[in-house]
Curated annotation (Swiss-Prot):
Signal peptide: none annotated. Belongs to the endoribonuclease YbeY family. Binds 1 zinc ion. Zn(2+) binds at H117, H121, H127. HAMAP family: Endoribonucl_YbeY (MF_00009). Its cofactor is Zn(2+). One of its GO terms (biological process) is rRNA processing. The gene is ybeY. Keywords: Cytoplasm, Endonuclease, Hydrolase, Metal-binding, Nuclease, Ribosome biogenesis, rRNA processing, Zinc. This is Endoribonuclease YbeY. PROSITE patterns: UPF0054. Single strand-specific metallo-endoribonuclease involved in late-stage 70S ribosome quality control and in maturation of the 3' terminus of the 16S rRNA.
């Protein structure tokens, strides 16, 4: 999992250097983004709790594969901190394993994709806002996965 997280953040770092603005971190300048160590929490849950959390967070009454809870700290507070908290990811293990089997994917490939997807949500990217946003997010995911020698999950 660490290699997936490192690849994701390295990719985003390069995109920020190229001018990408991160929706949830637009008040943080590129230099501060580059300097800070990024941190996040990852929690693994079961279907019962996953369903409860999805209902509470998204008003959807089923367990989903991954939930993202972005950090909402103001830039002024982040500026005082030694690290940059991105937020929390909650993975429903049973859903992730079931989806991998249904999609004929190795579990490690599927969890890698979900972690990348979740981190992008923590940064403010949202495929549910429209086709352009979905295309951008999927492009990021595909490029990061390719760097890890994992095939395009959308094929």
């Amino acid at each position: 999992m660490l290699s997936v997280m490192a690849a994701t953040l390295n990719y985003i770092d390069e995109q920020v250097k190229g001018g990408l603005i991160l929706p949830y971190f637009e008040d943080i300048d590129a230099e501060q983004w580059q300097e800070k160590i990024k941190v996040l929490d990852i929690y693994i849950t079961d279907e019962v709790e996953g369903r409860e959390l999805n209902l509470e967070a998204r008003q959807k009454d089923y367990a989903t594969n991954i939930l993202s809870y972005p950090s909402d700290l103001p830039a002024a507070i982040i500026g005082l901190m030694p690290t940059l908290p991105l937020g929390e990811l909650i993975i429903c293990h049973a859903v992730m394993i079931r989806e991998a089997a249904e999609q004929n994917k190795e579990a490690v490939q599927h969890i890698s994709h979900l972690l990348i997807h979740g981190v992008l949500h923590l940064l403010g990217f949202d495929h549910e806002l429209g086709q352009a946003e979905q295309d951008e997010m999927e492009r990021f995911e595909i490029e990061i996965l390719a760097g890890l020698n994992i095939p395009n999950p959308y094929n």
